[in-house]
Amino acid sequence: MNVRQKIGTVLIILAVTFTVYLSVIMIRRINAVVLKAAYTKIFCYELAACAFFILFALDVRFGFTGAEHQVLKVAGWCLRILVVLVTAVLLFFIGKITIGSFICTEAPAKNAIVLGLALENGKPADDLVSRLDTAEKYLQRNPDTTLILTGGNPDESGRTEAAVMRDLLAERGIKEDRLMLEDQAETTKDNFRNTARLINPDDPVVLISSNYHMDRAVQTAQSAGFSKILRLPAPSSLISFGANVMWEVMLELDGLVFGK
Protein backbone atom coordinates (compact mmCIF):
# COMPACT_ATOMS: atom_id res chain seq x y z
CA MET A 1 0.00 0.00 0.00
CA ASN A 2 1.52 3.31 -1.11
CA VAL A 3 1.25 6.67 0.66
CA ARG A 4 -1.77 7.80 -1.35
CA GLN A 5 -3.65 4.61 -0.55
CA LYS A 6 -2.85 4.98 3.15
CA ILE A 7 -4.11 8.57 3.13
CA GLY A 8 -7.23 7.44 1.28
CA THR A 9 -7.88 4.74 3.87
CA VAL A 10 -7.62 7.28 6.69
CA LEU A 11 -9.96 9.66 4.84
CA ILE A 12 -12.51 6.89 4.32
CA ILE A 13 -12.48 6.09 8.03
CA LEU A 14 -12.86 9.77 8.94
CA ALA A 15 -15.67 10.38 6.43
CA VAL A 16 -17.66 7.32 7.52
CA THR A 17 -17.12 8.12 11.21
CA PHE A 18 -18.32 11.70 10.70
CA THR A 19 -21.39 10.45 8.83
CA VAL A 20 -22.30 8.13 11.70
CA TYR A 21 -21.64 10.87 14.29
CA LEU A 22 -23.79 13.34 12.36
CA SER A 23 -26.59 10.81 11.92
CA VAL A 24 -26.76 9.99 15.63
CA ILE A 25 -27.05 13.66 16.61
CA MET A 26 -29.56 14.57 13.90
CA ILE A 27 -31.84 11.58 14.45
CA ARG A 28 -31.98 12.44 18.16
CA ARG A 29 -32.90 16.05 17.34
CA ILE A 30 -35.52 15.11 14.76
CA ASN A 31 -37.24 12.91 17.34
CA ALA A 32 -37.15 15.75 19.91
CA VAL A 33 -38.49 18.73 17.93
CA VAL A 34 -41.88 19.68 16.54
CA LEU A 35 -40.41 20.82 13.19
CA LYS A 36 -39.57 17.29 12.10
CA ALA A 37 -40.08 17.88 8.36
CA ALA A 38 -37.72 20.88 8.25
CA TYR A 39 -35.05 19.09 10.26
CA THR A 40 -35.37 15.96 8.13
CA LYS A 41 -34.89 17.98 4.93
CA ILE A 42 -31.63 19.49 6.18
CA PHE A 43 -30.50 16.08 7.42
CA CYS A 44 -30.95 14.71 3.89
CA TYR A 45 -28.77 17.56 2.57
CA GLU A 46 -26.15 16.68 5.17
CA LEU A 47 -26.14 13.02 4.15
CA ALA A 48 -25.65 14.08 0.52
CA ALA A 49 -22.67 16.21 1.59
CA CYS A 50 -21.23 13.28 3.54
CA ALA A 51 -21.61 11.13 0.43
CA PHE A 52 -19.33 13.54 -1.45
CA PHE A 53 -16.78 13.39 1.37
CA ILE A 54 -16.84 9.59 1.15
CA LEU A 55 -16.53 9.67 -2.66
CA PHE A 56 -13.56 12.03 -2.35
CA ALA A 57 -11.91 9.62 0.10
CA LEU A 58 -12.63 6.66 -2.19
CA ASP A 59 -11.06 8.51 -5.12
CA VAL A 60 -7.91 9.15 -3.09
CA ARG A 61 -7.79 5.50 -2.06
CA PHE A 62 -8.64 3.75 -5.33
CA GLY A 63 -8.44 6.40 -8.07
CA PHE A 64 -11.49 6.94 -10.28
CA THR A 65 -9.30 7.63 -13.32
CA GLY A 66 -7.34 4.40 -13.30
CA ALA A 67 -9.62 2.43 -15.62
CA GLU A 68 -8.09 1.16 -18.86
CA HIS A 69 -11.21 1.71 -20.99
CA GLN A 70 -11.31 5.27 -22.34
CA VAL A 71 -15.02 5.82 -21.61
CA LEU A 72 -14.58 4.71 -18.00
CA LYS A 73 -11.49 6.88 -17.67
CA VAL A 74 -13.39 9.97 -18.90
CA ALA A 75 -16.28 9.15 -16.58
CA GLY A 76 -13.79 8.80 -13.75
CA TRP A 77 -12.32 12.23 -14.46
CA CYS A 78 -15.79 13.83 -14.62
CA LEU A 79 -16.73 12.26 -11.30
CA ARG A 80 -13.41 13.32 -9.76
CA ILE A 81 -13.85 16.94 -10.89
CA LEU A 82 -17.41 17.04 -9.55
CA VAL A 83 -16.43 15.51 -6.22
CA VAL A 84 -13.43 17.81 -5.78
CA LEU A 85 -15.47 20.93 -6.61
CA VAL A 86 -18.32 20.04 -4.27
CA THR A 87 -15.90 19.07 -1.50
CA ALA A 88 -14.01 22.36 -1.94
CA VAL A 89 -17.25 24.36 -1.66
CA LEU A 90 -18.25 22.48 1.48
CA LEU A 91 -14.83 22.97 3.08
CA PHE A 92 -14.93 26.70 2.24
CA PHE A 93 -18.23 27.17 4.06
CA ILE A 94 -17.10 25.00 6.96
CA GLY A 95 -14.02 27.19 7.35
CA LYS A 96 -16.00 30.43 7.02
CA ILE A 97 -18.55 29.41 9.63
CA THR A 98 -15.91 28.07 12.02
CA ILE A 99 -13.84 31.27 11.81
CA GLY A 100 -16.98 33.35 12.28
CA SER A 101 -17.77 31.48 15.48
CA PHE A 102 -14.72 33.02 17.18
CA ILE A 103 -15.42 36.68 16.27
CA CYS A 104 -16.73 38.80 19.14
CA THR A 105 -17.33 42.56 18.79
CA GLU A 106 -19.36 43.12 21.95
CA ALA A 107 -19.89 46.71 23.13
CA PRO A 108 -22.55 48.61 25.10
CA ALA A 109 -25.78 49.10 23.15
CA LYS A 110 -29.37 50.13 23.78
CA ASN A 111 -30.74 46.84 22.43
CA ALA A 112 -29.59 43.23 22.22
CA ILE A 113 -31.25 40.46 20.23
CA VAL A 114 -31.28 36.85 21.41
CA LEU A 115 -32.12 34.35 18.69
CA GLY A 116 -34.29 31.41 19.64
CA LEU A 117 -33.70 27.72 19.06
CA ALA A 118 -36.23 24.94 18.56
CA LEU A 119 -37.37 23.42 21.85
CA GLU A 120 -36.51 19.77 22.36
CA ASN A 121 -39.29 17.73 23.98
CA GLY A 122 -40.78 21.01 25.19
CA LYS A 123 -37.60 22.08 26.96
CA PRO A 124 -34.84 24.53 26.00
CA ALA A 125 -31.84 22.83 24.42
CA ASP A 126 -28.44 23.25 26.05
CA ASP A 127 -27.38 25.74 23.36
CA LEU A 128 -30.47 27.87 24.01
CA VAL A 129 -29.66 27.91 27.73
CA SER A 130 -26.12 28.99 26.83
CA ARG A 131 -27.53 31.89 24.78
CA LEU A 132 -29.57 32.96 27.81
CA ASP A 133 -26.53 32.67 30.08
CA THR A 134 -24.63 34.95 27.72
CA ALA A 135 -27.54 37.39 27.52
CA GLU A 136 -27.93 37.51 31.30
CA LYS A 137 -24.25 38.33 31.80
CA TYR A 138 -24.47 41.03 29.14
CA LEU A 139 -27.47 42.61 30.88
CA GLN A 140 -25.55 42.63 34.15
CA ARG A 141 -22.71 44.51 32.47
CA ASN A 142 -25.10 46.89 30.69
CA PRO A 143 -27.99 47.86 33.00
CA ASP A 144 -29.68 50.11 30.42
CA THR A 145 -29.95 47.49 27.67
CA THR A 146 -33.27 46.03 26.52
CA LEU A 147 -33.29 42.41 25.40
CA ILE A 148 -35.35 41.34 22.38
CA LEU A 149 -36.18 37.64 22.61
CA THR A 150 -37.04 36.08 19.25
CA GLY A 151 -38.60 32.81 18.20
CA GLY A 152 -42.17 31.95 17.25
CA ASN A 153 -41.89 28.19 16.83
CA PRO A 154 -44.16 26.59 19.45
CA ASP A 155 -43.75 23.30 21.25
CA GLU A 156 -46.59 20.80 21.48
CA SER A 157 -48.22 22.85 24.25
CA GLY A 158 -48.14 26.05 22.17
CA ARG A 159 -45.36 27.84 24.06
CA THR A 160 -42.97 29.69 21.76
CA GLU A 161 -39.20 29.88 22.05
CA ALA A 162 -39.44 33.57 22.97
CA ALA A 163 -41.95 32.89 25.75
CA VAL A 164 -39.80 30.12 27.20
CA MET A 165 -36.75 32.41 27.18
CA ARG A 166 -38.73 35.19 28.88
CA ASP A 167 -39.88 32.82 31.64
CA LEU A 168 -36.38 31.48 32.24
CA LEU A 169 -34.87 34.96 32.46
CA ALA A 170 -37.67 36.10 34.76
CA GLU A 171 -36.87 33.16 37.05
CA ARG A 172 -33.29 34.46 37.17
CA GLY A 173 -34.48 37.84 38.37
CA ILE A 174 -34.42 39.79 35.10
CA LYS A 175 -37.20 42.38 35.18
CA GLU A 176 -39.79 41.98 32.44
CA ASP A 177 -39.57 45.67 31.51
CA ARG A 178 -36.10 44.89 30.15
CA LEU A 179 -37.48 42.13 27.92
CA MET A 180 -39.25 42.50 24.58
CA LEU A 181 -40.73 39.55 22.68
CA GLU A 182 -40.79 38.81 18.96
CA ASP A 183 -42.78 35.58 19.04
CA GLN A 184 -44.45 35.55 15.62
CA ALA A 185 -41.65 34.54 13.25
CA GLU A 186 -40.72 30.94 12.50
CA THR A 187 -37.47 31.64 10.61
CA THR A 188 -34.34 33.64 11.39
CA LYS A 189 -35.04 35.94 8.44
CA ASP A 190 -38.53 36.77 9.74
CA ASN A 191 -37.13 37.18 13.26
CA PHE A 192 -35.02 40.07 12.05
CA ARG A 193 -37.70 41.54 9.80
CA ASN A 194 -40.14 41.67 12.69
CA THR A 195 -37.52 42.95 15.12
CA ALA A 196 -36.68 45.77 12.70
CA ARG A 197 -40.25 47.01 13.27
CA LEU A 198 -39.75 46.99 17.05
CA ILE A 199 -36.44 48.88 17.20
CA ASN A 200 -34.47 51.19 14.94
CA PRO A 201 -32.28 48.95 12.73
CA ASP A 202 -29.86 51.84 12.18
CA ASP A 203 -28.88 51.85 15.86
CA PRO A 204 -26.08 49.60 17.14
CA VAL A 205 -27.49 46.26 18.28
CA VAL A 206 -25.84 43.33 20.02
CA LEU A 207 -26.56 39.97 18.41
CA ILE A 208 -26.50 36.97 20.75
CA SER A 209 -26.63 33.47 19.35
CA SER A 210 -24.63 30.26 19.42
CA ASN A 211 -21.09 30.63 18.09
CA TYR A 212 -21.68 28.32 15.12
CA HIS A 213 -24.78 30.34 14.16
CA MET A 214 -23.17 33.80 14.15
CA ASP A 215 -21.98 33.84 10.53
CA ARG A 216 -25.43 33.19 9.06
CA ALA A 217 -27.19 35.26 11.72
CA VAL A 218 -25.12 38.36 10.91
CA GLN A 219 -25.75 37.96 7.17
CA THR A 220 -29.49 37.58 7.79
CA ALA A 221 -29.58 40.62 10.09
CA GLN A 222 -27.80 42.72 7.50
CA SER A 223 -30.26 41.67 4.81
CA ALA A 224 -33.09 42.81 7.11
CA GLY A 225 -31.58 46.30 7.40
CA PHE A 226 -29.47 46.11 10.55
CA SER A 227 -26.29 48.03 9.78
CA LYS A 228 -24.40 48.18 13.09
CA ILE A 229 -24.21 44.64 14.43
CA LEU A 230 -22.14 43.82 17.49
CA ARG A 231 -21.42 40.09 17.69
CA LEU A 232 -21.64 38.25 21.01
CA PRO A 233 -21.36 34.50 20.38
CA ALA A 234 -22.55 32.11 23.07
CA PRO A 235 -20.45 28.99 23.67
CA SER A 236 -21.88 25.72 22.40
CA SER A 237 -21.28 22.04 23.02
CA LEU A 238 -17.93 20.86 21.65
CA ILE A 239 -19.36 17.39 21.12
CA SER A 240 -22.01 18.59 18.67
CA PHE A 241 -20.04 21.51 17.19
CA GLY A 242 -19.16 19.62 14.01
CA ALA A 243 -22.78 18.64 13.44
CA ASN A 244 -23.92 22.20 14.10
CA VAL A 245 -21.41 23.64 11.63
CA MET A 246 -22.61 21.19 8.97
CA TRP A 247 -26.19 22.23 9.73
CA GLU A 248 -25.24 25.86 9.14
CA VAL A 249 -23.43 24.99 5.91
CA MET A 250 -26.55 23.32 4.56
CA LEU A 251 -28.77 26.25 5.54
CA GLU A 252 -26.41 28.77 3.93
CA LEU A 253 -26.28 26.73 0.72
CA ASP A 254 -30.05 26.27 0.82
CA GLY A 255 -30.42 30.04 1.04
CA LEU A 256 -28.02 30.63 -1.83
CA VAL A 257 -29.62 28.06 -4.12
CA PHE A 258 -33.30 28.53 -3.27
CA GLY A 259 -33.21 32.09 -1.91
CA LYS A 260 -34.64 31.15 1.48
Sequence positions of predicted segments:
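Cytosolic-side transmembrane helix boundary signature
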Residues: 49-84
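Membrane-embedded alpha-helical segments of integral membrane proteins
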Residues: 6-63
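Helical transmembrane-bundle signal
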Residues: 18-22, 86, 90-93, 251
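Short coil-to-helix leader/linker segments, especially the first N-terminal amphipathic alpha-helix
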Residues: 75-100
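A structural signal for short, hydrophobic/glycine-enriched beta-strand patches
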Residues: 92-247
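A transmembrane-helix-recognition feature enriched in membrane-embedded lipid enzymes
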Residues: 241-260
